[in-house]
């Protein structure tokens, strides 16, 4: 990690509350902006908010607030302003002229965190693509800002020099990235098809950012994911084997955390993680039961899944942090839910049991077969490709009496039918 990434910049947060936004939603949104700032290695000095009928077309907030901000920047020696909404190119230009300090908006802040966290080649390419697409219409407006922004929050990824080059260069780079990404995506698609062909069930772990997905991903798969109490800790898809209590193996994918007010363009930029969701046989939806806005977080995830056309995939909901759950917490997911906490050792086994039970009820078909002991190859396949409940050797008939569960479309079904 270089020195630039460890510098803690001092930030003032700026928010504009419009009539359709409730006080509670606005407060949660500003708190989340503070968490995002912390994740990006920033230090929040204070927040400046204003209630308006509509955002000022020129400066987002009113002229008086702009003057107040200018004075605050000098008084608190702030390094940057972070706006809670996406600023238009003209707003950015006007504000940069009025206040001599670096400024970014919520979208840039999220992109910056994406750039900081990405680890795979595809993740890095997609972040650069999203940043360039965001920067292209803002080149003129940001000119003043970029020349004095230096490093720090909002400067990761493509970098200052790329953003200051002409539009043609950026468009060429966007074209190059799209070409490279299409190759990577084709490769991943072939890999996913191969996994499907092998008959392995795929489960996607989704949830609002910071709900505890990476912790549970590690616990359920014994993998070394990036576990930290920071927003967007996971950006690249991670898929690992998870062994259920019966010995049946499935694939579990960890995904980037969802967030409210996330522009659709940002969702599109992270196809790598979200494709895993669309291809899943089952979605595990993790919700932080200790968060005061847990119901809002749940709605956000469900809405984004609908936008991804993944809302018809079977879902098991897990309410996390049950040891810290709110006193008035009420599960909203109906019968298909479980309460868990990573603090309790036994909950990992209970979580796996719940997943296994759900698979049996909703996705697998029960079978009974009596397979001759001489069918060694088939017996081996049964152990690896089905969820076995009973595997008893009948000495009298020299056969194995087997019962369990299997996917209906698996090729092994044809072999099993001979002995059912």
Curated annotation (Swiss-Prot):
Question: For Mg(2+), which residues are the binding ones?
Answer: 214, 234
Loss of this gene results in the following: No visible phenotype.
In alphabetical order, the GO MF annotations are: GTP binding; GTPase activity; metal ion binding; ribosome binding
| Metal-binding in keyword set | yes
Presence of keyword Lipid biosynthesis: no
What is the annotated role of this protein in its UniProt record? GTPase that associates with the 50S ribosomal subunit and may have a role during protein synthesis or ribosome biogenesis.
Q: How does it assemble?
A: Monomer. Associates with the 50S ribosomal subunit.
Name it: GTPase HflX
Organism (species): Bacillus subtilis (strain 168)
